[in-house]
Amino acid sequence: MISMNPIMIRNNLSRSSSPAAPPTTNHSSTVDYFSIKPKLSLDINSQSDSNSTQSNNNEDTHSEQSDYNSYTHNQYYDSDDDEDDFDIRDQLLDPFDKITLSNCNEEYYSPLTPFDGQTTSPQDSIISSKSSNKSTTVVPSPQFQLTLPKLTTYSFLIVDDNIINLKILNRILLKLFPKCHIVQIQDSKLVKDLLHKQSFDSIFIDIEMPDVNGIDIAQFVRQDTKFDNMGMVAVTTRNSTQDLELFKQCGIDFTFHKPLNYSLDFMANSIDDIIITRKNKI
């Protein structure tokens, strides 16, 4: 009989009580990470695609619902706005339905469409201008005239006891002859001495002045042949036939009546004619 020590008996019992381990198979040679990686990638991509599709479907559904709500909302409020616009337009246009045209030849026409009120109506003129492609030639009004200043270097003497009249005539002469030289005298007693010291192309005199009036100055000028080439113009309120005849006898060449409501062309041409006529007499 074989004797066993306690240590051997304990080892045998532990071996007999533990289950048998299954046989192990080494797969390291056939299955690894690189062989299963493509499959894992396909599974992950397919899962993300399905999630994205579901999310897009949800967004499309929500967008369609929002568009429908927005459309119904806008349609409702647009109809209200249209009704308000029609009400405002009716309020503005209703008063004009009761207006009747009067004096259409003077009032009812386009300012850009010229027409002759004696030969055609403004309505016909407007219609014809719309249907016609030809340019309309606008005839300028005979009352409109362009006045060009004269650049002659005249020398003028103005004599008037009223300072306002002096300034008015001075301004007019400068408009007519921008290069002219003008001397103004308010004291008529100084005229004789000035005429002996300085020569002028023309002298403008007021008739009614204290001490030495315009008639006195005219007689003094025409008595001296030295001043035969100088024009003399009366600027006065006296315009009766007797006064004009008296002025002519005293040697006054022309008379402008106060106030000076003359066209600039008329005054410039009259002064030019007076000076030229006087100079040609020498």
From Swiss-Prot:
Composition bias, Low complexity: 12-30, 45-58, 125-139
Annotated region (Disordered), positions in chain: 12-31, 43-84, 112-139
Superkingdom of source: Eukaryota
Biased composition (Polar residues): 66-77
InterPro entries, alphabetized: Bact_response_regulator (IPR050595), CheY-like_superfamily (IPR011006), Sig_transdc_resp-reg_receiver (IPR001789)
KO phenotype (gene knockout): Causes defects in hyphal development, reduced resistance to osmotic and oxidative stress, and severe virulence attenuation in the mouse model of disseminated candidiasis.
ATP-binding found in the keyword field: no
GO annotation, biological process: apoptotic process; filamentous growth of a population of unicellular organisms in response to biotic stimulus; filamentous growth of a population of unicellular organisms in response to neutral pH; filamentous growth of a population of unicellular organisms in response to starvation; phosphorelay signal transduction system; positive regulation of filamentous growth of a population of unicellular organisms in response to biotic stimulus; positive regulation of filamentous growth of a population of unicellular organisms in response to neutral pH; positive regulation of filamentous growth of a population of unicellular organisms in response to starvation
Keywords (A to Z) from UniProt: Phosphoprotein
Molecular-function annotations in GO: phosphorelay response regulator activity
Modified residues (4-aspartylphosphate): D206
Location of the Response regulatory domain: 155-273
GO cellular component, one term: cytoplasm
Keyword Nuclease part of the UniProt annotation: no
Protein function: Required for stress adaptation, morphogenesis and virulence.
Protein name (Swiss-Prot/TrEMBL): Stress response regulator protein 1
